[in-house]
């Protein structure tokens, strides 16, 4: 029963912490497709989206 509570606590902590590995850039944007080339150039991934007029890249 102790192990179950430890695993539950670890799951809660991991879900609270931002584990998405998203990285904000200083590049401004108006649409997510503008971020794809920026993310490819800066972080070697083409997965990105425009959030609050800034590109966010996901690895």
From Swiss-Prot:
> In which tissues is this gene expressed?
Expressed by the venom gland.
Q: Where is this region: Interaction with Ca(2+)-activated K(+) channels?
A: 48-55
What Gene3D superfamilies is this protein classified in? Knottin, scorpion toxin-like
A cellular-component GO term for this protein: extracellular region
| Molecular functions (GO terms) | ion channel inhibitor activity; potassium channel regulator activity; toxin activity
Coiled-coil annotation: which residues? none
| UniProt keyword Disulfide bond present | yes
Which pairs are disulfide-linked? 29-50, 35-55, 39-57
Q: Looking at the keywords, is Cytoplasm present?
A: no
Check the record and name the InterPro entries matching this protein. Answer: Scorpion_toxin-like_sf (IPR036574), Scorpion_toxinS_K_inh (IPR001947)
Pyrrolidone carboxylic acid: residues carrying this PTM? 23
Residues carrying the site annotation Basic residue of the functional dyad: 49
Q: Which UniProt keywords apply?
A: Calcium-activated potassium channel impairing toxin, Disulfide bond, Ion channel impairing toxin, Neurotoxin, Potassium channel impairing toxin, Pyrrolidone carboxylic acid, Secreted, Signal, Toxin
Family, similarity comment: Belongs to the short scorpion toxin superfamily. Potassium channel inhibitor family. Alpha-KTx 01 subfamily.
| Biological role | Blocks calcium-activated potassium channels (Kd=43 nM on KCa1.1/KCNMA1). Has a potent presynaptic facilitatory action, with less effect on direct muscle stimulation.
Domain annotation text?
Has the structural arrangement of an alpha-helix connected to a beta-sheet by disulfide bonds (CSalpha/beta).
* Protein's name according to its UniProt entry: Potassium channel toxin alpha-KTx 1.2
């Amino acid at each position: 029963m102790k192990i179950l509570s430890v695993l539950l606590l670890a799951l809660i902590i991991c879900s609270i912490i931002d584990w998405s590995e998203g990285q904000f850039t200083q590049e401004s944007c108006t649409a997510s497709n503008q971020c794809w080339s920026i993310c490819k150039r800066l972080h070697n991934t083409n997965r990105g989206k425009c959030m609050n007029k800034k590109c966010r890249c996901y690895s």
